[in-house]
Amino acid sequence: VMDVDCKDQKIENISGVNSTKPEAIDEIASADLVTTAVGLVILPRIAPTIAQAIEKRMENGVKEPMNMIACENAIRGTSQLKKAVYENLSDAGKAYADEYVGFADCAVDRIVPPVKSENFIDVVVEEYFEWDVEKSGLKGELPQIEGMTLVDDLMAYIERKLFTLNTGHCITAYLGNLRGIPTIDKAIADEEIFGIVSAAMKESGAGLIKKYGFDPEKHAAYIKKIIGRFKNPYLQDDVTRVGREPLRKLSPTDRLIKPMMTAAGYGLPVDHLVIGAGAALHYDNPNDKQSVELQEKIGAQG
């Protein structure tokens, strides 16, 4: 845990199997709760394995419910996983899943930068975390897990996180990249970048307050807390990690365009959100497939 008080935390009682091996199907089929943290684009790749596990539960006559939660950095990630899983189920499997498999969307918030360690299983995280799970998507007895908050109106929490943390984070990364600044903490320390990011988060926040009725003072405090997380020098979070996959981040439902359109829809200013989106369009990283594709599109189409 890399923060003001850095500490090592040993996680025990874990095991692993290769997700491409039959053993993975057995492990999933015997679970009552399955969570993912693989990245949105990977969900369709693991969906066939999950579907096979559901089919196996059906064949074995398992009537106890199983719940799926995709802890991904996207809106309704579990719904997207469900769609991919159902595409790989038989009609009987779909009917079984409708009755016995829950797919609960969630909002997950914790900065996890790449690990600079000799031990490949080490993970670096910040102290702060939030995990909000939509109750209505769960089947059977509600799980009681430390750190999990069960909520009714998940979309408010999803968009609060997306429009605040994710929006501010990626704008910091793209502006930092334009200035040749390597890490988020150093980028947000730049006075001009700090000003643009803060203003953009206030613009997205104004849209959230209009849409969901968040308390303005509490939301201002939430923004301040998020910016404090960006300043954490212990994470050494690269702007290339935070800015990766710019096409996804520029999509209509993601962290740049969605908050801009929400605020603009209420007639609110979006000047600094536009600057952030513009910085994303300038993201040119030859090691990032989406960045290369983005620059090719701009070169060909303007």
Please describe what each predicted stretch is:
Residues 1-302:
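Substrate/ligand-engaging "lid" and interaction regions
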